[in-house]
């Protein structure tokens, strides 16, 4: 009889033999990490390894994973004949830190009623502080501006440098908090630093003001929570000992995404453990799926080092039942090529074993039905819009024949995802999205922004015409009468047209030569536009609510307009100095998928199985942890997935910054010089940017690996030449394409 009644694979059973000490587990995609960790928790409870007051602590990355773990553990406990809700606690790392701080907030200088600012509000405060800093330090732009023509330079000053400063400030503050550095400690070090470190100066000044605003509001952000929890436990040994006694076993999921401070917090709670101590720390993760390093403080090398140097046990979860053997073989080939043949030797550690082992050990042949023949790497050189059209055409053929299958289109950024969603909508194909904001939200925000922009500049005839055709008559914008009316409005005298006292004869004179149906359109829109103009003195929320019935027809659209109005009213209240253009800018950021709005959306607890027969459009980052029968991976060019070869470009190197510098890499290098002068003697500009290229290459290789391993049955990979027509196939795309063709010619006789 199986001593583990959970239906486990052999590699999973090895983990359930854990009794104490430190265990580090490298897991492949589809290895069942959640299943085996929840089974281990249930098994430790069943073996009565806990005192009545003790719990097993399970720490994971997302709120949806918390719910998933809780459900799984309860099911396992029922299988073992035990009560389903006793003996364990499941928390996110930030949730755990919040629990710790909430018990004794006064110990870390917080009021007992302290609040946690969500991502949206914390981002808004940071944006305002960063913009104030940039206005006070115009020399920053001069110091880093590249050689541009006059028009591009104006664009960079107006849009791109402000966004860059905000992004830099966020990276600096997150890093400083992960290192547990306060603005005061940083300032003290800077005053004793002989070198010029301008990017650290910038980061420190913005950090200090940002933190001052948070303190004034009695709030903390998510990055504060872990730092404060560490401070509290280090300053209160009795409290720490109580938590260590409460949680003798700590099981950590997605450990490849932990940061230094997060690892330190768990290390404190775990305390001294050995295989015979009756206490334990299990860390499970897949360093090959570490795809957040460049824009968070996540550090996948922490898990690798733990497994190699600290762990008492090092089992691997290498068996996967997710993907068919051909896709497994393709993913393994990518790992092998990166390790042995990547042109950048420094990037060859981006992907490491374990290789994926399919549950079926049968050789791949055309007769097995699901092998290499279900993988397509399209070598055709598409324009960006042609790639979208080709994928949509393919889906139009596939969806009717596969109503009970799941399918996803994976993109590299939210804006590209918006293009696919619009094309799917126009093609009449059912689609859902895992992007920063939904298409419905983006459309509503865009329409409202168009209307408000005209009200801000009411004499602008071009804007006036756009509002008429693209907003008020958007469902009929291609009809001849609408196009004719829009053409007339584009060149009209807006003041004369909207004047409240023209005689009918004056209107007829203005409309002379226009068909009657066009004149009727212009008279109708004149009434609407005049009514809108009368609303401009209203507060922004009342203005939007009054405009909404003229712009939207469905209950869902009107409800969304109400939410937008409420959100903008809150923003206006927090920023009484803001004018209408500032609020319009916020709407534009939502419309362009650059700003998350209202709530995290469907990705929390998203289940692809609930959307059979529909197309899911997702960024690769949002797709992590999910799987579909058929997957399209798009935009696999050397722009999105560079290999460090000549001609490759890097997103981290902004086009408007001189000398190809990555300002974030340079800033963090300057911070290292400040903190570790014995190791980083002299700051040399450009060195960090070159090193950041390698880091970016590594992360994009892992991102491609994640994308490939989302597919269960069929995989299609495409690429495009970009707006400037200079992109080529990503090098790993070309390598995998050549290898795949060889496999198909050989009849697929290789084992996965």
Cite the ranges covered by each PLM segment:
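P-loop NTPase Walker
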Residues: 1-112, 116, 241, 278, ...
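Conserved helicase NTPase motor core
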Residues: 4-35, 57-58, 89, 117-122, ...
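Helicase P-loop NTPase motor core
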Residues: 24-25, 31-37, 311-313, 320-429, ...
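Conserved short internal alpha-helix adjacent to the catalytic or cofactor-binding core
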Residues: 41, 73, 99-100, 108, ...
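Short glycine-/polar-rich loops that comprise or flank the Walker A/P-loop
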Residues: 51-55, 84-86, 277-280, 286-288, ...
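Short, polar/flexible loop-turn hinges at active-site or ligand-entry regions and domain interfaces
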Residues: 51-54, 77-87, 104-118, 130-143, ...
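ATP-hydrolysis module of ASCE/P-loop NTPase motor domains
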Residues: 84, 107-201, 205, 314-320, ...
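Conserved helicase C-terminal RecA-like lobe
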Residues: 453-710, 714-721, 739
């Amino acid at each position: 009889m199986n001593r583990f009644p959970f239906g486990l694979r052999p590699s999973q059973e090895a983990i359930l033999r854990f009794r104490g000490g430190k265990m580090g587990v490298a897991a492949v995609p589809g290895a069942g990490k959640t299943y085996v960790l929840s089974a281990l928790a249930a098994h430790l409870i069943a073996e009565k390894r806990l005192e009545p007051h003790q719990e097993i602590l399970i720490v994971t990355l997302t709120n949806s994973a918390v719910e998933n773990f809780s459900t799984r553990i309860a099911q396992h406990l029922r299988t073992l004949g035990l009560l389903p809700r006793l003996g364990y606690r499941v928390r996110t790392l930030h949730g755990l830190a919040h629990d710790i701080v909430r018990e004794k907030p006064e110990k870390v200088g917080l009021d007992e009623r302290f609040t946690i600012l969500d991502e949206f509000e914390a981002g808004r405060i940071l944006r305002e502080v960063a913009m104030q800093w940039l206005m006070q330090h115009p020399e920053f732009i001069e110091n880093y501006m590249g050689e541009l023509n006059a028009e591009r330079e104006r664009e960079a000053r107006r849009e791109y440098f402000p966004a860059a400063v905000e992004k830099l400030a966020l990276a600096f503050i997150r890093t400083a908090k992960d290192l547990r550095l306060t603005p005061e400690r940083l300032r003290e070090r800077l005053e004793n630093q002989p070198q010029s470190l301008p990017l650290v100066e910038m980061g420190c000044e913005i950090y200090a003001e940002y933190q001052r605003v948070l303190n004034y509001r009695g709030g903390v952000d998510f990055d504060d929570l872990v730092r404060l929890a560490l401070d509290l436990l280090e300053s209160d040994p009795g409290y720490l000992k109580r938590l260590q006694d409460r949680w003798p076993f700590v099981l950590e999921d997605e450990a490849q995404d932990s940061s230094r401070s997060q690892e330190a917090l768990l290390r404190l709670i775990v305390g001294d453990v050995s295989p015979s101590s009756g206490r334990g720390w299990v860390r499970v993760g897949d360093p090959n799926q570490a795809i957040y390093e460049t824009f968070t403080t996540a550090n996948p090398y922490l898990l690798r080092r733990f497994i190699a140097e600290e762990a008492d046990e090092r089992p691997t979860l290498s068996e996967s039942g997710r993907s068919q053997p051909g896709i497994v073989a393709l993913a393994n080939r990518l790992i092998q090529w990166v390790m042995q043949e990547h042109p950048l030797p420094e990037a060859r550690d981006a992907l490491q074993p374990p290789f994926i082992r399919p549950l079926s050990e049968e050789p791949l042949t055309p007769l097995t039905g699901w092998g290499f023949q279900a993988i397509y790497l399209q070598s055709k050189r598409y324009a960006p819009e042609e790639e979208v059209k080709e994928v949509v055409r393919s889906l139009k053929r596939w969806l009717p024949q596969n109503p009970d299958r799941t399918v996803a289109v994976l993109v590299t950024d939210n804006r590209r995802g918006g293009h696919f969603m619009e094309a799917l909508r126009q093609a009449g194909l059912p689609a859902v999205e895992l992007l920063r904001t939904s298409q419905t939200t983006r459309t509503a925000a865009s329409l409202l922004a168009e209307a408000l922009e005209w009200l801000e500049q009411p004499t602008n005839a071009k804007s006036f015409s756009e509002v008429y055709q693209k907003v008020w008559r958007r469902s009929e914008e291609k009809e001849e009468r609408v196009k004719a009316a829009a053409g007339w409005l584009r060149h009209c005298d807006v003041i004369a047209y909207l004047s409240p006292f023209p005689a009918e004869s004056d209107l007829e004179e203005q409309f002379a030569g226009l068909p009657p149906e066009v004149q009727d359109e212009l008279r109708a829109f004149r009434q609407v536009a005049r009514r809108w103009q009368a609303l401009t003195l209203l507060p922004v929320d009342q203005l939007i609510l009054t405009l909404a019935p003229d712009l939207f027809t469905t209950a869902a659209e009107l409800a969304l307009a109400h939410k937008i109005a409420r959100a903008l009213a809150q923003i206006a209240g927090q920023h009484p100095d803001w004018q209408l253009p500032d609020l319009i800018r916020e709407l534009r950021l939502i419309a362009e998928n650059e700003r998350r709005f209202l709530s995290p959306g469907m990705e929390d607890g998203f289940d692809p199985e609930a959307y059979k027969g529909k197309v899911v459009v997702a960024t690769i980052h949002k797709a992590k942890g999910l799987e579909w029968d058929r997957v399209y991976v798009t935009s696999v060019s050397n722009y999105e997935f560079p290999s460090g070869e000549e001609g490759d470009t890097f997103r981290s190197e902004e086009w408007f910054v001189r000398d190809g510098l990555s300002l974030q890499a340079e800033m963090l290098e300057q911070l290292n010089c400040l903190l570790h002068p014995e190791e980083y003697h002299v700051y040399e500009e450009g060195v960090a940017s070159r090193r950041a290229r390698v880091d970016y290459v590594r992360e994009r290789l892992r991102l491609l690996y994640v994308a490939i391993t989302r597919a269960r049955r069929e995989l299609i990979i495409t690429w495009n030449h970009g707006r400037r027509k200079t992109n080529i196939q990503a090098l790993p795309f070309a390598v995998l394409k050549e290898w795949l063709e060889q496999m198909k010619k050989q009849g697929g006789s290789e084992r996965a």
